[in-house]
Design a protein with these regions (language model features):
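Conserved catalytic core of the tyrosine transesterase superfamily
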Residues: 1-182
Length: 182
């Protein structure tokens, strides 16, 4: 069996921003992630985001031996591969079980392409927010994509026509002249 009761380390991660500039009261990565989760009021969203954040925190500590705020781009690339096929399986994969059970595992199996893309998107969003709060200096997940994942398509049915753009430009030019804008 695997023991998931890992002590929370308050030590400074390698990519933590200077404490004086941080706008969070978080003393460690876990508290910073909890602050991020508290932004999301919908219980289903909180559960989904917590699952992704906790999986990453566990992986960072157990497999890489580092804090969340010490992750580098190379770690994020390795995590992307890990999501495809979590290993060692006996540590990471198992049937559904209560989180309090010794049989609980973070994964039921490898994630689909879509699920991997979702996980990386959530984690990148979390790191963007942590940067905005000046908790960390960089987003290790920035630019990391999942091959084969569908990209969002541009909805051209909701765009301005050529005539509408002409009207917008005419009004904008009038505002510039009226208010002396350059």
């Amino acid at each position: 069996t695997t023991s998931w009761s890992l002590p929370l380390s308050p030590f400074m991660g390698l990519h933590r921003a200077p404490r004086a500039s941080c706008v969070l009261r978080a003393n460690n990565d876990y508290e910073a992630v909890q602050a991020w989760l508290s932004l999301h009021e919908a219980p289903a969203t909180q559960r989904a985001y917590r699952k992704e954040a906790e999986r990453l925190i566990l992986w960072a500590i157990v497999e890489r031996g580092v804090a969340l705020s010490s992750l580098a781009t190379e770690d994020a690339v390795a995590y992307r591969a890990f999501l495809r096929q979590p290993s060692p399986r006996q540590r990471w994969v198992g049937p559904a079980a209560p989180r309090t059970s010794a049989e609980w595992r973070p994964f039921a199996g490898g994630l689909s392409t879509r699920s991997r893309a979702y996980a990386l998107s959530v984690l990148s969003s979390m790191f963007r927010w942590l940067i905005e709060q000046r908790y960390v200096l960089a987003n290790p997940f920035a630019g990391i994509k999942v091959r084969g994942a569908r990209q969002a398509t541009l909805d051209t049915t909701r765009s301005f026509s050529e005539g509408e753009w002409k009207l917008v430009r005419t009004v904008a030019e009038g505002l510039e002249w009226s208010y002396g804008w350059q």
